[in-house]
UniProtKB/Swiss-Prot annotation:
GO biological process: one example: protein glycosylation
Keyword Membrane applies: no
CDD domains: DPM1_like
UniProt-recorded name of the protein: Dolichol-phosphate mannosyltransferase subunit 1
SUPFAM superfamilies, sorted: Nucleotide-diphospho-sugar transferases
GO cellular component: dolichol-phosphate-mannose synthase complex; endoplasmic reticulum membrane
Organism (species): Drosophila melanogaster
Residues binding Mg(2+): D101
Pfam families hit by this protein: Glycos_transf_2 (PF00535)
Magnesium keyword on record: yes
Co-factor: note: Binds 1 divalent metal cation.
Amino acid sequence: MPTNGHKYSILMPTYNEKDNLPIIIWLIVKYMKASGLEYEVIVIDDGSPDGTLDVAKDLQKIYGEDKIVLRPRGSKLGLGTAYIHGIKHATGDFIVIIDADLSHHPKFIPEFIKLQQEGNYDIVSGTRYAGNGGVFGWDFKRKLISRGANFLSQVLLRPNASDLTGSFRLYKKDVLEKCIASCVSKGYVFQMEMLVRARQHGYTIAEVPITFVDRIYGTSKLGGTEIIQFAKNLLYLFATT
């Protein structure tokens, strides 16, 4: 895929990802360079106590300040505000949102971009629940929670997307800004609300099947508090959309 005249800002919120960060950055550089695409990676670290920011600074020295942009914050303030913070510093006209824990393989980013260009879609979302998409590394309980949450979300919200709880997506920058401005949720529910608001705005959404792999290094941030918050916000969205 030759350079297409666009620039892609890859937003990567981090918290305690010092072991994963060098690998995910290396993979992003590999696949974006091979595709001939113009890009930057914006690392938004929320005061990680494990030294993630120091690792990011070392990676910036290796790949250059034009490719690795550091925009840290002092404390853990949530995904939604992390994206808002990152967008303020993004110089691309498209935004890619990706997790830093290696759950999302950067090899899919060029596929997102190719599909977006073919249909001029506003959003391209990675899906674990359509085509040859799937999840690897989760135990039965985690799969059941994810499937159940996604099914319930589909029934209540009808978002016209098969994977409402995923977070690996490509947005037109202005579309992302408008969706975020409409959102009230924080944490993991934020991703779900984004697609619901996109549907309300009439934006077009396409999907690319992805393989989601559970993190190798570090610990998952999903806990009981997040699940309860998810349920509350799901009911709120159902009542207001």
